[in-house]
Regions:
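Intrinsic disorder and flexible/low-complexity segments
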Residues: 57-62, 66-92, 96-97, 286-345
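Short glycine/threonine-rich loop-to-helix capping motif typified by GTGT followed
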Residues: 113-118, 250-253, 293-298
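Active-site proximal loops enriched in glycine and acidic residues that flank catalytic Cys/His/Asp
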Residues: 66-69, 106-108, 136-138, 151, ...
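C-terminal intrinsically disordered, low-complexity extensions immediately downstream
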Residues: 268-297
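Charged, glycine-interspersed solvent-exposed loop segments at helix/strand-loop junctions
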Residues: 1-24, 175, 179-270, 274, ...
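Flexible, low-complexity junctional segments that flank or bridge functional domains
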Residues: 1-61, 73-75, 88
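Extracytoplasmic
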Residues: 9, 37, 58-62, 99-101, ...
Length: 345
């Protein structure tokens, strides 16, 4: 639409130049045309806490630790839950005397099982010092539930996808393909167990049994973590587990979550539990800001991220396939993750 038709259709309120825009704001604020007004950037505004009404003069704080995205090894970033950033965030919140309670905001379909276990351990240590309350977003499944299950209280939305208590492992093998192509690879070792698993060699029954044993061991540990956190027997958890996916509403009925409510509700509960009347909230972890990527996400045409360029070049469907391949490539070791994507229509 042109700017004139956009106004006619009610998509915008007024067509104006930048100086007219500033003049309108001054008029709205009751300022003279020669006055100036304070403004903040969209980037700074996005980083301010908008989750609850905070008293920034208060000495007490409620920490909100965000665990968003696939769980993987390494540091992590705004789109992935990394061991390094999560453990450091929990340690900082735990050691800060001004922080009275911690709300762990989980929005993750899971991922690396070892990383999930290490984050679980950090939460267990934190609980000994101050309360940990979980607020589930769209997803808190598999590894996402793993890191949530031992919280003092778990809140979920009615539509949260949770549960998926199960694990799996991936062993890609190209031996048949390479044989057809006439490509042969050989390993030289002192004994049959000395060499690493090779994607170019047929999977032996012994190695398959070894891998299966590892998956079962991690699954048993997963069940025990949930049983301890939710005060159930392992058999009770197993009857709800085996990869089953539950909505937040159903998860409450079967005891996997405690209450239905959003982040506001979880923060309010944390404050009430610690008898904290006035408080500010503080977000963890802190990540470096990618200015260009942020503006690209806002849809500004002159700031385009590398991902947006790739999507434009290969098309939406091919881009989705590339993303799936990236996920598979990033999965190393045993996984506590949703083995599929859920789309809402």
């Amino acid at each position: 639409q042109t700017h004139e038709s956009a106004k006619t259709l009610g998509l915008v309120d007024q067509v104006a130049y930048e100086d007219q825009y500033h003049a309108a704001i001054k008029k709205k604020l009751g300022l003279a045309s020669t006055d100036t007004y304070e403004a903040i950037s969209v980037l700074d505004y996005a980083e301010t806490n908008a989750t609850t009404v905070s008293d920034f003069t208060a000495k007490s704080k409620i920490a909100i630790v965000y665990a968003q995205g696939d769980i993987g090894r390494g540091e992590g970033d705004v789109t992935t839950v990394g061991e390094g950033s999560m453990r450091r965030a929990l340690q900082e919140a735990r050691d800060d005397e001004a922080v009275k309670a911690i709300v762990l905001r989980v929005d993750s379909p899971g991922g690396d099982a070892l990383t999930s276990e290490l984050i679980w351990r950090e939460i267990e240590l934190t609980k000994k010092v101050k309360p940990v309350i979980v607020s589930m977003g769209n997803y808190a499944a598999s590894g996402g539930y793993y890191i949530a299950c031992n919280a003092d209280r778990i809140f979920a939305e009615n539509t949260t996808i949770t549960g998926s208590i199960g694990v799996f492992g991936l062993l890609p093998n190209f031996s048949k393909l390479t044989n057809k192509m006439g490509i042969h690879a050989e390993q030289v070792a002192t004994h049959q167990n000395a060499a690493e698993y090779s994607v170019f060699q047929p999977l032996t029954p012994a190695y398959a049994a070894y891998a299966q044993k590892g998956v079962e061991r991690v699954y048993t540990t997963f069940l025990s973590r949930v049983a301890a956190g939710r005060k159930m027997t392992v058999d009770q958890v197993d009857s709800l587990a085996q990869g089953r996916v539950w909505s937040g509403a159903d998860a409450k009925k079967i005891g996997l979550v405690d209450e239905i409510g959003g982040l506001h509700t979880a923060v309010a509960y944390a404050a009430k539990k610690t008898k904290t009347k006035t408080y500010a909230t503080q977000n963890f972890p802190e990540y470096k800001r990618d200015f260009n990527a942020f503006l690209g996400q806002l849809g500004l045409p002159f700031f385009t991220s590398k991902e947006a360029l790739l999507q434009e070049q290969v098309g939406v469907e091919n881009y989705k396939l590339i993303q799936q391949l990236r996920k598979v490539q990033a999965r190393k070791g045993i996984q506590a993750a949703l083995p599929f994507d859920i789309q809402f229509h």
